[in-house]
UniProtKB/Swiss-Prot annotation:
The keyword Cytoplasm does not apply. Keywords: Lyase. One of its GO terms (biological process) is tetrahydrobiopterin biosynthetic process. This is Putative pterin-4-alpha-carbinolamine dehydratase. It is an enzyme of class 4 (lyase). The keyword Acetylation does not apply. It holds the Pfam family Pterin_4a. It catalyses: (4aS,6R)-4a-hydroxy-L-erythro-5,6,7,8-tetrahydrobiopterin = (6R)-L-erythro-6,7-dihydrobiopterin + H2O. Its EC number is 4.2.1.96.
Length: 96
């Protein structure tokens, strides 16, 4: 997949089509909450495997049962179709 920067109208659609994600400072971000650390870490492991598949890696933070994920494409300096695809895949993992 060749990444390209999303236009303003595509960014507005993104936050509607992919629930829970917000646009913050040239990136999209979502916070995920779990019952405990083990569930949070299990989620992160599943996300890591998808990230490797796309060769696209998030900035993320784990605080006990909370995981905060931020996505952007550094090489292009903003939010791309690749970030959108990865956010959608991450939501699918969370919804399982």
């Amino acid at each position: 997949m060749e990444p390209y920067l999303l236009r303003d109208e595509e960014l507005k659609e993104l936050v509607v089509k992919i629930p829970g994600w917000e646009i913050k400072s040239e990136q999209i971000q979502r916070e995920f909450s779990f019952a405990n650390f083990i569930e949070a870490f299990s989620f992160m492991t599943k996300v890591a495997l998808i990230c490797e598949k796309y060769n696209h890696h998030p900035n993320w933070e784990n605080i006990y049962s909370k995981v905060i994920i931020s996505l952007n494409t550094h090489d292009l300096g903003g939010i791309t179709n690749l970030d959108q695809t990865l956010a959608s895949e991450i939501n699918k993992i969370f919804d399982q």
